[in-house]
């Protein structure tokens, strides 16, 4: 994107905020294009307070954002970690005061890799322990209250069936390698892997969504678009993809100590869910229909596009 286009987009998004009565300014505002669902501008108001302005990229994002708003209202009353406090929520714009802390990593779009704001090889004990504490608290949240607040609740048997159905759908529409398909089916068919309970999960837990303080302790979580009551293993999949099995075992140990609910094959289940992550990539690609996303999905599925 050229500087001119960036300026125009910043002006547009700041204009949307100002039309809602938020006195933010485009001077020194910054654009962040790394998210797949939102274009984001960071801008300050008359008092110097920094704000996050999110403009949905697609209509399906607008629909899911209303669910995210319900989730955040529930979390602000039930989770000690910091979460966004939406002050503006319209189909065109979401705005909230920027939270304290720094994302554990940003994303370099050109290099397609993380730009870290912390020591991550390996992550510090403070980071792992505080993340485990927050996950244990989140996953231990009362499900009945969550459901009554309007958060989607998926029973364990339904989550498993939905996973199997998604695999079939992706295979029919995009294809999948035989090796991957056989692995998925063994996992879906084996009761030993699957938990008999669901938990309130973040659903898209990776470094840009994790806020840390100057000592590397986790203080808050961003971007709750995928939150629901579902399989708790999902909140460990991206962590294991990035940091590996050994570090995930350390996180699970602290999670257990913090009161998180563990089962015998939990880490093996995480590994199998990780192997099925191409399904998530494919679902996004089928939703956006963008060539870049389709190609990414085909590669992850082990399908050659001729």
Curated annotation (Swiss-Prot):
InterPro entries on file: AGP_Transferase, Aminoglycoside_PTrfase, Kinase-like_dom_sf
Gene3D superfamilies: 3.90.1200.10, Phosphorylase Kinase, domain 1
Source taxon at top rank: Bacteria
GO terms, molecular function: ATP binding; kinase activity
Keywords from the UniProt entry: ATP-binding, Kinase, Nucleotide-binding, Transferase
UniProt KW Hydrolase keyword: no
Catalytic center residues: 204 (proton acceptor)
PANTHER family, sorted: AMINOGLYCOSIDE PHOSPHOTRANSFERASE DOMAIN-CONTAINING PROTEIN (PTHR21310:SF15), AMINOGLYCOSIDE PHOSPHOTRANSFERASE-RELATED-RELATED (PTHR21310)
Family: Belongs to the aminoglycoside phosphotransferase family.
Protein name per the record: Uncharacterized protein YcbJ
Origin species: Bacillus subtilis (strain 168)
